Design a protein with these regions (language model features):
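N-terminal Rossmann NAD(P)H-binding glycine-rich loop of SDR-like oxidoreductase domains
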Residues: 2-22
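A conserved pocket-lining segment of Rossmann-fold NAD(P)-dependent short-chain dehydrogenase/reductase
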Residues: 131-135, 182-207
Length: 247
């Protein structure tokens, strides 16, 4: 049985779909009263709980072999954010502790490329660059770095865990519309008539889901893996969208 936290999120619901397609048993952890549209039609178990509730996590992990921890809050705003830090750091600490108590076979934690130390533009980012909870900008960035370090420190205490760090995730089933998903939608609807300089490494959400499963199956305990796609300029991305919708 696989427990997926953050199961209705963009990566989470695609991961659940991929696990189901492979015949894997899935238990999805949802917030109380959370909408289930992203998981509609899937043969899964649903339990309600919160990563800030240790008792709920222990109940959710009963009989679970693998935990995919994706639950968290995303913010692109600079500065501190107490709720982001609490959910992403304390929530992950709780998941780690519950995983160790439940004796799960493996924890797969979804971190972020933004948790990795910033380097000059000419340097290629790879897994040799450390996580940096201090020198990076937003509350989200630092919270993901701190949470990742918590997971890796738990490995030294006996937890079997691996970490994945996706880059810019795009693709289908973006029910809540991420920042990039909203930009893509607005561009397709001709609501955005301008472009901006710059580029980013984008990765298909379906590849991320498969990467998570590969990390579970083949990843080495205590290692982290960057899930990357292709560097695309924003202007190229927007031009491609306009071309496909006939604008």
């Amino acid at each position: 049985m696989n427990l997926v936290t953050g199961a209705t999120g963009h990566i989470g619901n695609v991961l659940v779909k991929e696990l189901c397609a492979r015949g894997e048993g899935v238990r999805a952890l949802l917030l109380p009263g959370e909408g289930r549209l992203p998981l509609e039609g899937l043969d899964i178990q649903v339990v309600e709980g919160n990563v800030l509730d240790s008792k709920a996590l222990r109940r959710a992990m009963a009989g679970v072999e693998v935990v995919y921890h994706l639950a968290g809050l995303i913010s692109i705003l600079p500065g501190t954010d107490a709720l982001v830090e609490r959910v992403n750091v304390v929530g992950t600490q709780n998941v780690v502790q519950a995983s160790m108590e439940a004796g799960v076979r493996r924890l797969v934690y979804t971190s972020s490329i933004h948790a990795i130390k910033r380097v000059p533009g000419e340097i290629v980012i790879d897994e040799s660059i450390p996580f940096d909870p201090v020198g990076i900008g937003s509350a989200y960035d630092s919270s993901k770095a701190i949470a990742t370090i918590e997971v890796l420190e738990a490995v030294e205490k006996g937890l079997d865990a691996v970490v994945v760090c996706p880059t810019g995730v795009i693709g289908p089933y973006d029910y809540r519309r991420s920042e990039m998903g909203q930009l893509i939608f607005d561009t397709a609807k001709a609501r955005v008539q301008f472009s901006v300089d710059g580029a980013y490494d984008f990765v298909d959400v379906r590849d991320v889901a498969k990467g998570l499963i590969l990390a579970c199956q083949r990843g080495r305990t205590g290692e982290h893996y960057i899930l990357s796609g292709e560097r695309i300029t924003i202007s190229t991305l927007m031009a491609t969208i306009r071309e496909h919708v006939g604008l």
